[in-house]
Amino acid sequence: MERIKELRNLMSQSRTREILTKTTVDHMAIIKKYTSGRQEKNPSLRMKWMMAMKYPITADKRITEMVPERNEQGQTLWSKMSDAGSDRVMVSPLAVTWWNRNGPMTSTVHYPKIYKTYFEKVERLKHGTFGPVHFRNQVKIRRRVDINPGHADLSAKEAQDVIMEVVFPNEVGARILTSESQLTITKEKKEELQDCKISPLMVAYMLERELVRKTRFLPVAGGTSSVYIEVLHLTQGTCWEQMYTPGGEVRNDDVDQSLIIAARNIVRRAAVSADPLASLLEMCHSTQIGGTRMVDILRQNPTEEQAVDICKAAMGLRISSSFSFGGFTFKRTSGSSIKREEEVLTGNLQTLKIRVHEGYEEFTMVGKRATAILRKATRRLVQLIVSGRDEQSIAEAIIVAMVFSQEDCMIKAVRGDLNFVNRANQRLNPMHQLLRHFQKDAKVLFQNWGIEHIDNVMGMIGVLPDMTPSTEMSMRGIRVSKMGVDEYSSTERVVVSIDRFLRVRDQRGNVLLSPEEVSETQGTEKLTITYSSSMMWEINGPESVLVNTYQWIIRNWETVKIQWSQNPTMLYNKMEFEPFQSLVPKAIRGQYSGFVRTLFQQMRDVLGTFDTTQIIKLLPFAAAPPKQSRMQFSSLTVNVRGSGMRILVRGNSPVFNYNKTTKRLTILGKDAGTLTEDPDEGTSGVESAVLRGFLILGKEDRRYGPALSINELSTLAKGEKANVLIGQGDVVLVMKRKRDSSILTDSQTATKRIRMAIN
């Protein structure tokens, strides 16, 4: 109030008013400030001042022919004065209004296509639902998030080439469009943008939004997918949050989510196979996510998640240098250590060999629901500052940090034996043994850790062994903070190596990732994941294994039946029969296999007993290592639907049902495909179904040209000879019969003759 009175007083003196209104602003510093550089120093003032003028806008001279001098109200729309310093005319804001209402209409067909990301955003917001506002302390941590919903995942360079090709197709310059996504997008956009009148520069900007993932390092408390980030300013403040459900999903979020699920499933499956690395690569290469090859997505998608990074490492791609332990991402922020093997005794006097990190180090730990700063020395936790969503999440972080510290009191807190195994039934390494043990029950660990008095520090609070907060006491070195710890912001990627057991190491040999670190969380993928590899058949349970195995046999029947007759051992060892073995009761697998193999051998030896349906039905049972026994079976058991179900050796059953009339096979009531030939030819020898009507003359004869496939035989004229490829690359010479009457005998002799011709 005093100040205002004083100012009023000053202003009442006429001299003051005169000085303030008449004095020229000739102070050099002020003039410099407002006139140097192109940058506007006070944009809002400048705007207000300009708009107060009559003609604040300049326009091309042509405007005078297109816009009348006055509008309906008689207001002047443009001035006859030229703009100083250019050949443009001065225009009133009213001219803009006139133009918007009465100006020429252009086609709007391209707008939704060009401004696609904006139109889609409006739709998402229109259909989104905003819930109540809650006032509470927001623990935000900075995370690298995707700020651009609805984009493809091209690299900046790839996108640049696509944009140049679409917007400036005739510009000179080397552009190589190699990836499938580049070619598809270019073709699609060129078609969409025919006769487009929107300025090329604008089109280029908008295309960039659509093609490239843009990330920012932002403080986030809730969801991190791009449809949440686009409304971040509406959903979380410093002390409030507003519930929001997006009104639509975007493909890039769905790709990220589905990629994580596919990668987890693949790593889990590969870990239990005989050669994890080879299996993992085979699965990554044969899997599609939403119709795109998984390996293409891995090359372009920057998602950082343990399983995804293991897949990337296997493909030789660079990944982040942070490492993972107990589901937390650790990044060393200072210090260093050397590693040394040391033997330690648990509370149960079990000896563990652990790799001890000697030296002082500081780490940030970032998990899904908690974050922390950890300072540690050799086998000693110096300080842990943790923050999390709830008690449970904070406890998880504390356990991981205590185990990671390798302190003696932690190892002594072990009660009972440590014998945790992974999915492949191999013992876990000692650090993961300890982790699993305390994740199951941390009571003794927390009780034995030790308590200390604490100082009152702003924003920090103590935590007792039973996880209750306290301002006086806390577990030694451990504090809970209201502030979160930011995620590691760098996007730097490093070269890594991966061993046969999927352990990923940096170039110094530090383990960054291993299958133990892959989350067991199950989720439902947003996009369809198609695993073509037989290793993934079991992901949907026993029924899926059953159906897939028989579908595979039917799809590959031409090759399968040839192998069946000529190289059965190779056929039995096919990896496609591996998943099926888990359905056959362990105790009897060997006997079933021996029985079926003997039965098949009899079929091969005794002409005329070849029965397609029976071979298909029993083949998967022959894949197990056979036990020789005199046992005969009339039915074989498989474990599906929670109990043993029977497959009849002769005849149909609910599990395996072949309909002779429709030639369709149903497995547990599900359609498994159609057989292309009639399986009920009692006499049909292996190739006979195919070679009826041909006489087998003997070994290949080069004079009759290159070998034809069985399907090409139909083109031969009667009496014509040709070489034909049968089986695994065996070639025999045949002649098309002149008379049809003798066709029947071919069936019986074909098998014998093929064998003789080959041998």
From Swiss-Prot:
The UniProt entry annotates the motif Nuclear localization signal at 736-739
Concerning SUPFAM superfamilies, the annotation shows: PB2 C-terminal domain-like
Primary residence: virion
What are the record keywords, sorted?
A: Cap snatching, Eukaryotic host gene expression shutoff by virus, Eukaryotic host transcription shutoff by virus, Host gene expression shutoff by virus, Host mitochondrion, Host nucleus, Host-virus interaction, Inhibition of host innate immune response by virus, Inhibition of host MAVS by virus, Inhibition of host RLR pathway by virus, Inhibition of host RNA polymerase II by virus, mRNA capping, mRNA processing, Viral immunoevasion, Viral transcription, Virion
Q: Which GO terms describe its biological process?
A: 7-methylguanosine mRNA capping; cap snatching; DNA-templated transcription; symbiont-mediated suppression of host cytoplasmic pattern recognition receptor signaling pathway via inhibition of MAVS activity; symbiont-mediated suppression of host gene expression; symbiont-mediated suppression of host mRNA transcription via inhibition of RNA polymerase II activity; viral RNA genome replication
Q: Which GO MF terms are attached to this record? A: RNA binding; RNA-directed RNA polymerase activity
* Job description of the protein: Plays an essential role in transcription initiation and cap-stealing mechanism, in which cellular capped pre-mRNAs are used to generate primers for viral transcription. Recognizes and binds the 7-methylguanosine-containing cap of the target pre-RNA which is subsequently cleaved after 10-13 nucleotides by the viral protein PA. Plays a role in the initiation of the viral genome replication and modulates the activity of the ribonucleoprotein (RNP) complex.
Protein name, UniProt field:
Polymerase basic protein 2
Lineage at the top is:
Viruses, Riboviria, Orthornavirae, Negarnaviricota, Polyploviricotina
